[in-house]
């Protein structure tokens, strides 16, 4: 079924998925494929419905969501503050871009073909346990209350506040989709990090360039720091980057996107009740050291669907303990200024094969590979930070904002 009129008809689904972002769509798709009855609750049109977003990830071969991939790149590049270039083909991996609108249309078309799936437009207010499952209390677009029931509920809505943590940085960015008057981009190469931009007093900043054609690209200015900028400050940084650094010449900004992604060593609870689970960024699927989320969401969705198909409900951790420990050390080292961010990332990609770095960031590396990666970082500052972390208390700060990349 496609998006349908809400009707509290006494239906009890095996699963209710709250939120129609990457995590909710992926899980609804996986559950439907596993033969699990599912209702996907999406926000109605209006201020609660998120704007078009860009999600990127790397993958080998052809994925099952290839129809929603708008571009992919065979070669990846990192530029140091001095212009030093590290460029590599991380075969068999390719870097891919998905636009949220295309992804939503693709998943909706697949859900429409299933008699066990439905998509409801409603505003979810409360999720709570109930006898033999859980309930989602909603309001329909015309203002009527609606209670949805499921044996299990998977909630992807952003958490109200970041859980207790020792370190919290924000990855915040604004990007322009630009069209230039001359063919200035190489569609085969994506710039993951370009540190030739002025660096902030605290944290780090870089450019991010994803060419879509010789004369079109997504160009972003990104910072890892404690506070986001104003829109005018992002615009100024983008003007400087496109004119003074990239020297793109005359261009037209066709659209823009902006977001904030928490980078933290907080532990996000994945189960909040006997039948209620958190998924996606709300369930810890954002990689703390990078802000990437989409690939982990897919892994998590596959595992949940496989477990439910066997009659069990689990939401596995998106990343292993070693990866989380290494990320916690890096975040603290960046936040304290013990390591120079631009130099750290430039040297990491220069000293470690790019395919190995990407596998590590996707939680696919071996302990020996991770040991080797650790030896190619500033050992002294990182070791000092690792020894300090167990003695630091976790604290709670303000609201968590999420716009996963």
Segments predicted by a language model, with ranges:
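N-terminal FAD cofactor-binding segment of flavoenzymes
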Residues: 30-83, 102
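N-terminal Rossmann-like FAD-binding beta1-loop-alpha1 element of flavoenzymes
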Residues: 5-40
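C-terminal helical "tail/cap" subdomain of flavin- and related membrane-associated enzymes
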Residues: 302-405
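Flavin-binding catalytic cores
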Residues: 227-257, 277, 299-320
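Predominantly flavin-linked oxidoreductase catalytic cores and closely associated redox partners
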Residues: 30, 110-251, 264-267
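Short FAD-binding loop at a beta-strand-to-alpha-helix junction that anchors the flavin cofactor
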Residues: 209, 271-289
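Short hydrophobic core segments
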Residues: 16-18, 41, 147-160, 276-281
């Amino acid at each position: 079924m496609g998006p349908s009129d809400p009707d509290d008809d006494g239906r009890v689904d095996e699963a209710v998925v709250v939120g129609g972002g990457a995590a909710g769509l992926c899980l609804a798709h996986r559950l439907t494929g596993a033969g699990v009855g599912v209702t996907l609750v999406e926000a109605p049109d209006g201020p609660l419905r998120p704007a078009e977003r860009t999600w990127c990830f790397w993958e080998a071969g052809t994925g099952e969501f290839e129809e929603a991939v708008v571009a992919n790149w065979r070669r990846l590049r990192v530029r140091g503050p001095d212009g030093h270039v590290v460029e590599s083909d991380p075969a068999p991996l390719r870097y891919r871009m998905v636009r949220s609108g295309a992804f939503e249309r693709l998943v909706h078309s697949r859900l429409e073909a299933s008699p066990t799936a439905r998509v409801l437009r409603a505003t979810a207010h409360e999720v709570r346990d109930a006898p033999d499952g859980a309930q989602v209390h909603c309001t329909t677009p015309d203002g009527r209350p609606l209670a949805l029931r499921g044996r299990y509920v998977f909630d992807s809505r952003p958490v109200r506040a970041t859980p207790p943590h020792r370190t919290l940085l924000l990855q915040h960015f604004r990007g322009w989709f630009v069209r230039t008057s001359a063919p200035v981009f190489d569609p085969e190469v994506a710039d993951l990090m370009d540190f030739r931009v002025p660096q902030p007093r605290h944290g780090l900043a870089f450019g991010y360039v994803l060419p879509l054609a010789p004369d079109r690209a997504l160009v972003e200015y990104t910072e890892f720091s404690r506070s986001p900028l104003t829109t005018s400050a992002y615009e100024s940084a983008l003007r400087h980057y496109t004119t003074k650094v990239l020297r793109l010449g005359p261009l037209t900004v066709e659209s823009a996107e902006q977001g904030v992604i928490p980078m933290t060593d907080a532990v996000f609870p994945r189960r909040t009740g006997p039948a209620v689970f958190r998924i996606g960024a709300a369930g810890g699927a954002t990689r703390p050291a990078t802000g990437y989320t989409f690939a982990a969401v897919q892994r998590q969705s596959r595992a949940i669907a496989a477990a439910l198909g066997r009659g069990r409900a689990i939401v596995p951790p998106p990343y292993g303990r070693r990866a989380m420990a290494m990320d916690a050390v890096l975040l603290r080292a960046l936040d304290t200024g013990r390591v120079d961010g631009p130099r750290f990332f430039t040297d990491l990609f220069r000293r470690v094969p790019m395919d190995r770095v990407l596998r590590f960031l996707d939680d696919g590396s071996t302990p020996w590979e991770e040991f080797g990666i650790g030896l190619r970082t500033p050992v002294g500052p990182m070791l000092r930070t690792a020894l300090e972390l167990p003695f630091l208390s976790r604290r709670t700060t303000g609201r968590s904002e999420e716009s996963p990349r």
